[in-house]
Design a protein with these regions (language model features):
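Conserved positional slot within leucine-rich repeat
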Residues: 67, 92, 115, 141, ...
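C-terminal capping segment of individual leucine-rich repeats
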Residues: 84, 107-108, 132-133, 164, ...
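Leucine-rich repeat domain C-terminal region
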Residues: 222-225, 454-455, 481-483, 531-554, ...
Length: 650
């Protein structure tokens, strides 16, 4: 375990008064205080002096929680931190640098909660071992298992899991189950704990789910009388990605899951479904048979093919509204035939609605919101993405709802400055997403008069009329800002001057996206690297995500400013690999806990945007990543400098 000596009054920490003072305190007192800290903070303390390091070593043998999601730890790091602890009850870890060899370290009988993300290099052995060892498990979340070439999962592994973990209450398997199970294998979930209340599956065929829920068994009293299966009967929250949402699967879910409160269904067909295998008005009539549903999301994604729910009309919305009078949130994506009449019926019938989302509402117009004041609605989240017929008038009507906190208008290309004038008067607004709208610098200046001080997230990606002027106006340093996330991607008129204004303002931005801004260059990186958000912290301390992909002015000079000590909290970096591949690779090796993307991938959202854009932004202030500093130390500078020298020689 590497440590860092602290210099105190010109001497080593081992000889300073600070450590001698700590020695006077009872170790039990120090350890009791340390039990309130997370793993990153404990590792930070361990690197300061021998006394604290000794206490941390003992605390790590009995701390109940080990949660590290912002850094992918290596096997060499995980082993000494986890191995001595036989009382660990909750493990949450990013496994991006781990594989099957770590199973014995991670899986232990004491665990009641396991959440492992990025398990690409694990096979089904991980799932099987959890079932064999973790008999008291209550929560299990596994992401991306066996996605690496050569890894696989077999049916037996899932059987071991469901047979062994008989107390599971939450189960989330976020990978494609259809790759490893045949449609007839759906009944394997009949082994699941009857205590299960939350089920989330990354991908499963609708046929498999339908067969699971509609299977019958013979009554013991009457061998000829079929009895409906009680599989998943206590599930309250169900979130599925299926190959095709259809009437059969909706009917099976509605009739079998009598305790259901939350239902999220998403599909992404590779071709237009046939009528017999698609969702229709009749299918919507089956939803919420038991009247308990509070949250509903039905989304057809165009990820693979431009498909929509072409067999659902306004009549289907009428059926849905009639069955969902008590619903609190609804998200409808891909209902291309539904008109104002259908959407308006939902709005006016569901008096408790607080979240309303429509994606690809091609027939939705301003008339839906014309008389919204006549309702008793108190909407906090509204998402109207890719509703091309909406104009400023609709937003003006929506803005009469002063409880709005999250407003997503991405892709509403007919929205202009008058909409922003209305939005500026929303006192609780925290998230504003305006990608692809027709707003100008003048429109954004209206925000200065109202919501600007409380706004946490702003996105103006692809708003072609914008220039540096709006940035200079908004970031003039005249007010304290709450803004954490800013997306300025694909603004072709944006220059380094805009980023200078941002850096000078000292805004505590944690997520900054500048992708495809052709006039942004090295000067912007230098300005951001030199930013001091707080007086007592190091330069550039607030940024956790920086996306510079396809910024035309970025050269190898920027990489000198992407090294430590600059950007100490940075976790995600988007860059164009062709700038200089050797330097990009050297940076990735120098900062192994920094996820460097060179192929234009969207950073940091993990696909959440596909489910419900009203909830895609989680606003938490980033804390300085002392864990990474402790793990990495000062090694690796020479390697990157060598790559730079070789580049200079070329």
């Amino acid at each position: 375990m590497s440590t860092t000596n602290i210099v105190c009054d010109g001497g080593d920490v081992d000889g300073c008064d600070g450590e001698r003072s700590l020695d006077l305190l009872p170790a039990a007192l120090l350890e009791t205080i340390m039990t309130k800290l997370d793993v990153a903070s404990l590792c930070s303390l361990a690197s300061t002096c021998k006394t604290l390091r000794s206490c941390v070593t003992r605390v790590l043998t009995f701390t109940p929680n080990f949660h590290v999601f912002n850094v992918s730890l290596s096997m060499e790091t995980v082993r000494p931190l986890l191995f001595p602890n036989q009382k660990l009850s909750s493990l949450k870890l990013d496994c991006g640098r781990l594989g099957n060899s770590a199973i014995d370290i991670l899986v232990r009988p004491s665990l009641r909660e396991i959440s492992l993300q990025n398990c690409r290099d694990f096979s089904g052995d991980l799932i099987s071992e959890i079932g064999r060892k973790c008999k008291d498990l209550r929560l299990l979340c596994l992401g991306s298992v066996a996605e690496k070439v050569g890894r696989t999962i077999n049916r037996c592994a899932l059987e071991d899991l469901l047979n062994g973990c008989s107390h599971l209450e939450v189960l989330a398997l976020m990978f494609d189950l259809s790759l490893y199970l045949r449609p007839s294998d759906g009944r394997i979930f009949g082994l699941v704990s009857d205590k299960l209340t939350h089920l989330e599956l990354g991908h499963i065929s609708s046929r498999m789910m339908t067969q699971l829920l509609t299977s019958t068994e013979t009554s013991r009293q009457d061998s000829n009388k079929p009895v409906t299966s009680t599989v998943l009967q206590n599930v309250q929250q169900l979130r599925l990605s299926v190959d095709c949402i259809n009437d059969a699967v909706v009917k099976a879910i509605s009739k079998s899951l009598t305790s259901l409160i939350d239902l999220d269904l998403r599909d992404a067909p590779i071709e237009d479904p046939r009528q017999v295998s698609d969702l229709t008005d009749s299918g919507l009539q089956e939803i919420n048979q038991n009247g308990k549903l509070k949250h509903l999301s039905l989304i057809r994604s165009q990820e693979f093919h431009p498909t929509y729910f072409r067999r659902v009309s306004d009549q289907g919305m009428l059926f849905l509204a009639d069955k969902c009078l008590g619903i609190k949130s609804i998200c409808l994506g891909g209902f291309c035939r539904v008109t104002d009449a259908g959407f308006k019926t939902v709005l006016h019938s569901c008096a408790n609605l607080s979240k309303f989302s429509v994606y690809h509402g091609y027939k939705l117009t301003d008339l839906v919101f014309h008389d919204i004041l006549a309702t008793t609605l108190s909407l906090s989240h509204v998402s109207l993405r890719l509703c091309h017929l909406l104009t400023d008038h609709a937003v003006q009507k929506l803005a009469s709802n002063l409880d709005l906190e999250n407003l997503d208008l991405r892709g509403c290309r007919n929205l202009r400055d008058e909409a922003l004038k209305a939005i500026s008067h929303l006192p609780k607004l925290k998230v504003l997403l305006l990608d692809g709208t027709d707003i100008s610098d003048t429109g954004l200046s209206y925000l200065k008069e109202g919501v600007w001080g409380s706004l946490v997230s702003l996105s103006v990606r692809g708003c072609r009329n914008l220039t540096d002027k709006f940035m200079i106006t908004l970031f003039d340093g005249s007010s304290k800002l709450a803004l954490r996330e800013l997306d300025l991607s694909n603004l072709h008129n944006l220059t380094d001057a805009a980023i200078f204004a941002l850096a000078k303002s000292g805004a505590p931005i944690t997520k900054l996206q500048l992708r495809e801004c052709r006039l942004i260059g090295d000067s912007s990186v230098m300005a951001l690297a030199s930013t001091r958000v707080y007086e007592d912290e190091c330069p550039g301390s607030s940024l956790c995500l920086l996306d510079l992909y396809d910024c035309g002015g970025i050269t190898q000079l920027s990489f000198k400013w992407l090294k430590k000590p600059f950007f100490p909290r940075l976790k995600w970096l988007g860059i164009t690999g062709s700038v200089n591949r050797d330097i990009v690779d050297a940076l990735a090796r120098r900062r192994p806990h920094l996820q460097v993307s060179c192929r234009g991938e969207e950073l940091g959202n993990d696909g959440e945007d596909d489910w419900d854009s009203a909830d895609i932004h989680q606003h938490t202030e980033a804390q300085e990543d002392e864990l990474e500093q402790w793990i990495l130390g000062d090694e690796g500078d020479v390697e990157m400098e060598d790559a730079e020298d070789e580049s200079d020689e070329d």
